[in-house]
Amino acid sequence: MDFFYIGVMSGSSLDGIDIALLKQDDRSRLLATHYIPMPEDLHAELLGLCSSGADELARAAIAEQKWCRLVAQGVQTLLQDQNMVPAQIRAIGSHGQTIRHEPSRGYSIQIGNPALLAELTEITVVSDFRRRDIAAGGQGAPLVPAFHEALFDDNKDHRAVLNIGGFSNLSLIESDRPVEGFDCGPGNVLLDAWISSQLHESYDKDGAWSASGKVDSALLQKLLSDQFFLTKGPKSTGREVFNLGWVKHHLFQSKTLAPEDVQATLLELTALTITDSLKSAQPITRELLVCGGGAHNKALMKRLAELLPDTEVSSTEKFGVNPDWVEAMAFAWLAHCCLEGVPANRPTVTGAKGRRVLGAIYPA
């Protein structure tokens, strides 16, 4: 039977909200999309909630209502554009907005008010995907490797899927064993934070500013000495660890560098932590498929290819899947798994003690 789902993803980069319409039968097909740029005031509020501050509970409650109403408007626009009505959609899979992720302390917090979203859209909402995995001893992240396996596993060995959003994560796909995966470290988060602090730009288009600088090996080695990079998976991370303050802490201990050299070094950090992780976990990788915003960073993609000379590095576009929409598609698929009672976590990815059905259901 064919079902229609909507997936909603707002990642750690906080740049906007991705909404994807999916047709789900024996495979997942992307039908339509809608993108909402994050309003500046809401971006600032959400970024502030990612670190300790005053009156956090009230601020989070207000921010998630604003976020939710934006999503509801986006869903309605998407349906209108497709001449569809809410009754045709089986469910919305809403990731929400992560404001804290500390699985070592037993929690990951995504705000988004799924009850209000169900009320505003008149569509069943599935949300809160991470906490069941954490309850079972897992990291609660990354959750997309199971979807990567479903989407890109055509019985070819030695394939990996790399998602580069605010943070980077790998899915290792082999035909004879369950998918494996983990967070590698910062993706765009440090690159975006540094260029914002220096040039007041939201991101480094094509990695051009990074490409104009030179890597400082001393700073790079200091950054690579972080305990996260020395830890084997399963592992996940977030803004609690990697943020502008983390960069400035290491810069304080270094010689004065040109801003573009810092950016070049941060790009090298992203590239090296990805490729070193891949070589360690899957020594032979014939094909690396890249999705997420980082797939558009030409300097980063070029560096990945240089560091992996025996691996074909390409965008998921090669499979006819737009790299910008893979995560939103994944949460539509996760909603489908929840309603079908299909476990969607992978213990080989998160470290949970078993497979679990993920998500909480808010009926229309």
UniProtKB/Swiss-Prot annotation:
Q: Which domain of life is it from?
A: Bacteria
Report the coiled-coil segments. Answer: none
Q: Is the Transferase keyword given for this protein?
A: yes
Q: Output the Gene Ontology terms for molecular function.
A: ATP binding; kinase activity; phosphotransferase activity, alcohol group as acceptor
> Which SUPFAM superfamilies does the entry mention?
Actin-like ATPase domain
In the Enzyme Commission scheme, what number(s) does this protein have? 2.7.1.170
- What PANTHER family would the database entry show? ANHYDRO-N-ACETYLMURAMIC ACID KINASE (PTHR30605:SF0)
Q: What is this protein called?
A: Anhydro-N-acetylmuramic acid kinase
Q: Which organism is it from?
A: Pseudomonas syringae pv. syringae (strain B728a)
Top-level taxonomy: Bacteria, Pseudomonadati, Pseudomonadota, Gammaproteobacteria, Pseudomonadales
